[in-house]
Amino acid sequence: MSDIINETKSKMQKSIDNLSRELANISAGRANSNLLNGVNVDYYGAPTPVQQLASISVPEARLLVISPYDKSSVGNIEKAINAANLGVNPSSDGEVIRISVPALTEERRKELVKDVKKIGEDAKVAVRNVRRDSNDELKKQQKNSDITEDDLRTQTDDVQKLTDDSIKEVEKLLEEKEQDIMSV
Protein backbone atom coordinates (compact mmCIF):
# COMPACT_ATOMS: atom_id res chain seq x y z
CA MET A 1 0.00 0.00 0.00
CA SER A 2 1.33 3.41 -0.88
CA ASP A 3 2.11 6.20 1.53
CA ILE A 4 -0.75 8.25 0.12
CA ILE A 5 -3.28 5.50 0.89
CA ASN A 6 -1.94 5.13 4.44
CA GLU A 7 -1.99 8.90 4.93
CA THR A 8 -5.54 9.06 3.54
CA LYS A 9 -6.68 6.33 5.92
CA SER A 10 -5.06 8.15 8.86
CA LYS A 11 -6.62 11.53 7.99
CA MET A 12 -10.07 10.03 7.48
CA GLN A 13 -9.81 8.24 10.82
CA LYS A 14 -8.90 11.55 12.47
CA SER A 15 -12.07 13.10 11.01
CA ILE A 16 -14.14 10.22 12.44
CA ASP A 17 -12.40 10.50 15.83
CA ASN A 18 -13.08 14.24 15.87
CA LEU A 19 -16.75 13.57 15.10
CA SER A 20 -16.92 11.06 17.97
CA ARG A 21 -15.48 13.65 20.37
CA GLU A 22 -17.94 16.31 19.21
CA LEU A 23 -20.91 13.95 19.53
CA ALA A 24 -19.81 12.94 23.02
CA ASN A 25 -20.12 16.58 24.09
CA ILE A 26 -23.79 16.71 23.07
CA SER A 27 -25.97 15.80 26.03
CA ALA A 28 -28.84 13.43 25.32
CA GLY A 29 -30.68 14.29 28.53
CA ARG A 30 -28.63 11.92 30.66
CA ALA A 31 -25.79 12.81 32.96
CA ASN A 32 -22.44 12.08 31.37
CA SER A 33 -18.97 13.15 32.51
CA ASN A 34 -18.19 14.12 28.89
CA LEU A 35 -20.54 17.06 29.45
CA LEU A 36 -17.65 18.75 31.28
CA ASN A 37 -15.07 18.20 28.52
CA GLY A 38 -13.68 21.56 27.53
CA VAL A 39 -14.61 23.24 30.82
CA ASN A 40 -11.48 24.91 32.15
CA VAL A 41 -11.24 26.27 35.67
CA ASP A 42 -9.07 29.23 36.66
CA TYR A 43 -6.94 27.39 39.23
CA TYR A 44 -4.18 29.54 40.74
CA GLY A 45 -4.13 31.64 37.58
CA ALA A 46 -3.86 28.73 35.13
CA PRO A 47 -6.76 27.34 33.06
CA THR A 48 -7.09 23.72 34.19
CA PRO A 49 -9.56 21.04 32.98
CA VAL A 50 -12.19 20.10 35.59
CA GLN A 51 -11.17 16.43 35.26
CA GLN A 52 -7.75 17.29 36.72
CA LEU A 53 -9.21 19.09 39.73
CA ALA A 54 -11.99 16.74 40.79
CA SER A 55 -13.44 13.28 40.55
CA ILE A 56 -16.63 13.18 38.52
CA SER A 57 -19.27 10.53 39.15
CA VAL A 58 -22.73 9.76 37.81
CA PRO A 59 -24.71 8.27 40.73
CA GLU A 60 -28.08 8.64 38.95
CA ALA A 61 -29.21 8.95 35.32
CA ARG A 62 -29.71 12.73 35.55
CA LEU A 63 -27.19 13.66 38.25
CA LEU A 64 -23.51 14.49 37.99
CA VAL A 65 -21.46 14.82 41.18
CA ILE A 66 -18.14 16.66 41.14
CA SER A 67 -15.89 16.13 44.17
CA PRO A 68 -12.93 18.55 44.05
CA TYR A 69 -9.64 17.26 45.45
CA ASP A 70 -9.00 20.76 46.81
CA LYS A 71 -12.15 22.01 48.59
CA SER A 72 -11.07 25.64 48.10
CA SER A 73 -11.58 25.26 44.33
CA VAL A 74 -15.34 24.52 44.62
CA GLY A 75 -16.31 28.14 43.85
CA ASN A 76 -13.98 28.38 40.86
CA ILE A 77 -15.26 25.09 39.41
CA GLU A 78 -18.87 26.21 39.86
CA LYS A 79 -18.09 29.55 38.19
CA ALA A 80 -16.39 27.80 35.23
CA ILE A 81 -19.37 25.46 34.72
CA ASN A 82 -21.77 28.43 34.72
CA ALA A 83 -19.53 30.31 32.27
CA ALA A 84 -19.44 27.31 29.89
CA ASN A 85 -23.16 27.73 29.06
CA LEU A 86 -23.92 24.02 29.25
CA GLY A 87 -27.60 24.57 30.00
CA VAL A 88 -27.24 23.20 33.54
CA ASN A 89 -27.22 24.83 36.97
CA PRO A 90 -24.58 23.55 39.36
CA SER A 91 -25.40 23.60 43.06
CA SER A 92 -22.78 23.34 45.76
CA ASP A 93 -22.76 22.54 49.46
CA GLY A 94 -19.18 23.77 49.86
CA GLU A 95 -17.65 20.31 49.44
CA VAL A 96 -19.22 18.79 46.33
CA ILE A 97 -20.97 20.22 43.30
CA ARG A 98 -24.13 18.58 42.01
CA ILE A 99 -25.38 19.10 38.49
CA SER A 100 -28.91 18.03 37.74
CA VAL A 101 -29.28 17.42 34.01
CA PRO A 102 -32.76 18.55 32.92
CA ALA A 103 -34.96 16.23 30.86
CA LEU A 104 -35.02 17.29 27.22
CA THR A 105 -38.19 18.68 25.70
CA GLU A 106 -39.30 17.36 22.30
CA GLU A 107 -38.37 20.72 20.76
CA ARG A 108 -34.88 20.64 22.30
CA ARG A 109 -34.39 17.04 21.11
CA LYS A 110 -35.19 18.08 17.54
CA GLU A 111 -32.77 21.01 17.84
CA LEU A 112 -30.04 18.66 19.04
CA VAL A 113 -30.72 16.25 16.16
CA LYS A 114 -30.31 19.20 13.75
CA ASP A 115 -27.00 20.06 15.41
CA VAL A 116 -25.88 16.43 15.18
CA LYS A 117 -26.75 16.33 11.47
CA LYS A 118 -24.78 19.53 10.85
CA ILE A 119 -21.75 18.16 12.71
CA GLY A 120 -22.09 14.94 10.72
CA GLU A 121 -22.26 16.81 7.44
CA ASP A 122 -19.09 18.71 8.40
CA ALA A 123 -17.38 15.37 9.09
CA LYS A 124 -18.47 14.02 5.69
CA VAL A 125 -17.12 17.16 4.00
CA ALA A 126 -13.80 16.68 5.84
CA VAL A 127 -13.61 13.06 4.61
CA ARG A 128 -14.38 14.14 1.05
CA ASN A 129 -11.73 16.87 1.23
CA VAL A 130 -9.18 14.23 2.25
CA ARG A 131 -10.28 12.16 -0.77
CA ARG A 132 -9.89 15.15 -3.09
CA ASP A 133 -6.42 15.98 -1.74
CA SER A 134 -5.31 12.35 -2.07
CA ASN A 135 -6.61 12.06 -5.64
CA ASP A 136 -4.89 15.33 -6.58
CA GLU A 137 -1.62 14.03 -5.13
CA LEU A 138 -2.00 10.73 -7.05
CA LYS A 139 -2.65 12.60 -10.31
CA LYS A 140 0.39 14.77 -9.67
CA GLN A 141 2.53 11.66 -9.14
CA GLN A 142 1.19 10.12 -12.36
CA LYS A 143 1.89 13.35 -14.24
CA ASN A 144 5.48 13.28 -12.92
CA SER A 145 5.72 9.63 -14.06
CA ASP A 146 6.17 8.42 -10.46
CA ILE A 147 3.28 5.98 -10.88
CA THR A 148 1.69 4.33 -13.92
CA GLU A 149 -1.84 4.99 -15.11
CA ASP A 150 -2.89 1.54 -13.85
CA ASP A 151 -1.46 2.36 -10.41
CA LEU A 152 -3.32 5.66 -10.49
CA ARG A 153 -6.61 3.92 -11.26
CA THR A 154 -6.03 1.24 -8.60
CA GLN A 155 -5.05 3.72 -5.91
CA THR A 156 -7.88 6.10 -6.81
CA ASP A 157 -10.27 3.16 -6.37
CA ASP A 158 -8.64 2.40 -2.99
CA VAL A 159 -9.11 6.03 -1.92
CA GLN A 160 -12.78 5.86 -2.98
CA LYS A 161 -13.27 2.65 -0.99
CA LEU A 162 -11.73 4.30 2.09
CA THR A 163 -14.02 7.29 1.55
CA ASP A 164 -17.12 5.08 1.27
CA ASP A 165 -16.15 3.17 4.44
CA SER A 166 -15.50 6.41 6.33
CA ILE A 167 -18.82 7.95 5.24
CA LYS A 168 -20.63 4.76 6.38
CA GLU A 169 -18.88 5.01 9.76
CA VAL A 170 -19.91 8.67 10.08
CA GLU A 171 -23.52 7.79 9.22
CA LYS A 172 -23.51 4.96 11.76
CA LEU A 173 -22.25 7.31 14.51
CA LEU A 174 -24.88 9.90 13.57
CA GLU A 175 -27.71 7.37 13.61
CA GLU A 176 -26.64 6.07 17.04
CA LYS A 177 -26.49 9.60 18.45
CA GLU A 178 -29.86 10.57 16.95
CA GLN A 179 -31.48 7.46 18.47
CA ASP A 180 -29.81 8.28 21.79
CA ILE A 181 -31.21 11.82 21.71
CA MET A 182 -34.73 10.85 20.59
CA SER A 183 -35.14 7.98 23.09
CA VAL A 184 -36.97 9.26 26.15
UniProtKB/Swiss-Prot annotation:
Signal peptide coordinates: none
Gene name, Swiss-Prot/TrEMBL: frr
One Pfam family of this chain: RRF
Localization terms from the record: Cytoplasm
Organism: Staphylococcus saprophyticus subsp. saprophyticus (strain ATCC 15305 / DSM 20229 / NCIMB 8711 / NCTC 7292 / S-41)
UniProt KW Amino-acid biosynthesis keyword: no
Name the record gives this protein: Ribosome-recycling factor
Keyword Cytoplasm found: yes
Lineage: Bacteria, Bacillati, Bacillota, Bacilli, Bacillales
Cysteine-cysteine disulfides: none
GO CC terms in record: cytoplasm
GO molecular-function terms, A-Z: ribosomal large subunit binding
Family: Belongs to the RRF family.
